[in-house]
Design a protein with these regions (language model features):
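Conserved beta-alpha-beta core of the PfkB/ribokinase-like small-molecule kinase fold
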Residues: 138-214, 221, 231-232
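Short, electropositive alpha-helical surface patch
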Residues: 62-75, 180-187, 213-216, 248
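Glycine-rich phosphate/adenosyl-contacting loop at the front of the ribokinase-like
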Residues: 1-76, 115, 323
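Active-site metal-binding loops of divalent metal-dependent hydrolases
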Residues: 12, 136, 165, 261
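Conserved N-terminal subdomain of the carbohydrate kinase-like
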Residues: 50-133, 314-323
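Conserved phosphate-binding/catalytic region of the ribokinase-like
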Residues: 1-5, 152, 206-323
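Glycine-rich phosphate/pyrophosphate-binding beta-alpha loops
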Residues: 89, 135-139, 294, 300-303
Length: 323
């Protein structure tokens, strides 16, 4: 038996999210712990799974805050390294009236980029059922090598590999370089979670199914999930395509972490049920639960510390079924 259900590698940072205005009319920002891979793990931990994180923060106030935050929510932080020279990565999140957002990163460099392959905790990866990663840990040479080394260990250990590109164009030297690394990820995963705009950017196809077919012609990925924001989500598995509508909320504040919450719930379903012989009914159940969880997180500031409980997700499902 492996010790962990899911181990993730990547960025752990502070998301400064707008939280009203001061008496002088200046914007107030709240320092929320964030970073896609840890958001995914936080959702999984909330649902009772054993998780661990591999990454790097600075030896500074924010780095300590982040280590405390992930430990507090139950993520094993033994693979989290500290950089004495480089500060913890920061992101300013600008939220639009509809809850969508834009990011400005303070990462030139940031501690998350400084992880090297010698710092990878092999034991964590060898002891996990699922290994999850994104592309923020592939933007620069050193951390890219660390990510590829972690993928190699995961493959050798027989872990299922999950990939969410989580494209952030400002962090790349060029979008061609970003595409090259996304394609590397596609070549090494069995579960792909990709957003609607990412699939259009990557494949040049406006139609999501045509985009998935483009990917499938090149890579053998058993389970592909497309998150479509206000349109819901789709799962592509073998010959099946299942689409589930979203659970739209009147009181949406921001969408930060919604895709990560969705991804965490998908991995939860795979941890519970495996990936063999999933029927359309299974895929529908998986997407419905994941959409509901993502919907709940849009009503909250931040993500990592405030992931919904199983009960909150079930209550929303019951409430909507009664409407």
């Amino acid at each position: 038996m492996k010790k962990y259900d899911v181990v993730a590698l990547g960025e752990l940072l502070i998301d400064f999210t707008e939280n009203g205005k001061s008496n002088q009319g200046n914007p107030l920002f709240e320092a929320n712990p964030g970073g896609a891979p840890c958001n995914v793990l936080a959702m999984l931990t909330k649902l009772g799974h054993k998780t661990a994180f591999i990454g790097k923060v600075g030896e500074d106030f924010f780095g300590e805050q982040l280590r405390d935050a992930i430990t507090e929510v139950g993520i094993d932080a033994s693979g989290l390294c500290t950089d004495k020279e480089i500060h913890t990565t920061l992101a300013m999140v600008h939220t639009y009236p509809d809850g969508d957002r834009d990011f400005s990163f303070y990462r030139n460099p940031g501690a998350d980029m400084m992880l090297n392959k010698e710092e990878i905790c092999e034991e964590l990866i060898k002891e996990t059922k699922i290994f999850h990663f994104g592309t923020l840990s592939m933007t620069h040479e050193g951390v890219r090598e660390a990510t590829k080394e972690a993928i190699r260990i995961a493959e050798e250990s027989g872990a299922t590999i999950s990939f969410d590109p989580n494209l952030r164009p400002p962090l790349w030297n060029s979008l061609d370089e970003a595409k090259e690394q996304v394609l590397y990820g596609l070549g090494h995963c069995q579960i792909l979670k990709i957003s609607d705009n990412e699939i259009q950017w990557l494949t040049g196809e406006e139609d999501y199914t045509a985009g998935v077919n483009w990917i499938r012609e090149r890579y053998q990925i058993p389970l592909i999930l497309v998150s479509m924001g206000k349109e819901g989500s789709r799962a592509y598995y073998n010959g099946s395509i299942v689409e589930v509508k979203p659970f739209l909320q009147k009181n949406t504040i921001e969408t930060t972490g919604a895709g990560d919450t969705f991804c965490g719930c998908v991995l939860h379903y795979i941890c519970e049920h495996g990936m063999e012989d999933l029927k359309e009914e299974n895929l529908k159940d998986m997407l419905t639960f994941a959409n509901a969880a993502a919907s709940v997180i849009t009503t909250r500031k931040g993500a990592l510390r405030v992931m919904p409980t199983r009960e909150e997700i079930q209550n929303l499902l019951i409430e909507r079924a009664a409407e």
